Regions:
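A metal-dependent, Asp-based hydrolase signature
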Residues: 48-112
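Glycine-rich phosphate-binding "P-loop"
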Residues: 104-117, 190-197
Length: 280
């Protein structure tokens, strides 16, 4: 029986908090230069605004056409966007929304993402090696080359040549965040107990990738692994796949509870559990 595994990478196989520190520092350095403020002042604002985001995790998220499509508290990359917006507001800088969005997302995010370090979660090598017998793909919102570089680094640390089979099975820029209300065969949203807003399900670009990788296999044979339920797992769960939430200290309580309670949901913190779930 063909078993398909769709694996997110950043934050799922890596320690997002540790690898994201250079991204965070570089982003704040650029904000200081752009606003003309002292770095110390920017750092103070960042600490204050980050605390606000973490204190009210339901209120902040990745906005797509004015709607939250992913929570912001989950990792330093997502947290930086509302923090940076608050810093620009406080400085009265880049007030135009189009200009601000291009600056924060298309320029500063992309440029500083390249500064990330390579810090893997415990047992990432063992977990990835165990997935070779399956039809395993890495599907990420990031660009392909940085993720391939991380896999090559993990290969060198774990066992050289262990992940050569994965070389051409990395798909980047998956647009998991792009929500469009045009897939009428799917519900528009999920309601998670404990979360006041809806989780938006109709993500056509991500769905087309999942459908292509699935081929003619039933959804029951597809397992999707990610660290953010709303971004990585909500859509495949609705489609009928099994989903694995690789939780961390910043995973929202409502995501943990919903996945743990669902018959096709699997909540883990040890990546070595993935193989057994695929073989269920």
């Amino acid at each position: 029986m063909r078993r398909i595994v769709v694996l997110d990478f950043d934050g799922t196989m890596t320690d997002a908090e540790a690898e994201g520190r250079p991204f965070w520092e570089g982003y704040l350095e650029d904000l200081a230069a752009l606003t003309g403020r002292e770095r110390r002042e920017i750092d103070e604002m960042a600490r204050r605004f980050e605390a606000e985001v973490l204190a009210s995790p339901q209120e902040y998220g990745w906005l797509w056409k004015g709607r939250i499509v992913c929570p912001a508290a989950v990792d330093p990359y997502q947290r930086m966007i509302p923090v940076a917006r608050k810093i620009l507001d406080a400085c009265g800088a880049f007030k135009g929304e189009d200009e601000r969005a291009r600056l924060l997302d298309a320029v500063l995010f992309k440029y500083n993402y390249r500064k990330t370090e390579r810090v893997f979660r415990p047992y990432a090598g063992e977990a990835l090696a165990s997935l070779e017998p399956f039809d395993t793909w890495v599907v990420t919102n990031a660009h392909v080359e940085p993720v391939k570089a991380k896999i090559a680094d993990l290969d060198a640390r774990y066992k050289r040549g262990a992940f050569s089979w994965l070389g051409e099975k990395v798909i980047g820029r998956a647009n998991k965040h792009v929500v469009e209300d045009r897939e009428l065969d799917l519900p528009a949203e999920l309601r998670l107990p404990g979360l006041a807003r809806p989780v938006l399900v109709r993500r056509p670009h991500y769905r087309s990738l999942l459908e292509r990788l699935r081929g003619d296999a039933p959804w029951e044979q597809v397992t999707v692994v990610g660290d953010i339920f709303e971004l990585d797992l909500a859509l495949p769960l609705v489609l009928g796949a099994h989903v694995v939430l690789a939780a961390n200290a910043f995973t929202p309580t409502w995501e943990r509870a919903y996945v743990a309670a669902h018959e096709r949901g699997h909540l883990i913190e040890d990546l070595r559990e993935i193989e057994g779930i695929v073989l269920r």
